[in-house]
Amino acid sequence: MTDNAVLLGEGFTLMCLGMGFVLVFLLLLIFAIRGMSLAVNRLFPEPPAAPKPAPAAVAPADDFARLKPAIVAAIHHHRRLHP
């Protein structure tokens, strides 16, 4: 009976050591990736963003007045072709 308890204790010890090593490795990996990212950004900085062009002028509110004759002509043409 005591042999099983010792074996179970060694199993838990081995499990904790394994999880500890994996945790340490993953933390080191995270810091290494962050360090490489900082190094790359220092050596090869991104170029400054080009200024955005000014927005195009907004069409006047009475734009419908210019389009009204074209719309009427299109409706007339459609009705003439499809009575």
UniProtKB/Swiss-Prot annotation:
It catalyses: oxaloacetate + 2 Na(+)(in) + H(+) = pyruvate + 2 Na(+)(out) + CO2. It is an enzyme of class 7 (translocase). It is found in: Cell membrane. The gene is oadG. Catalyzes the decarboxylation of oxaloacetate coupled to Na(+) translocation. It holds the Pfam family OAD_gamma. It comes from the Bacteria. Coiled coil: none annotated. InterPro entries: Na_pump_deCOase, OadG. This is Oxaloacetate decarboxylase gamma chain.
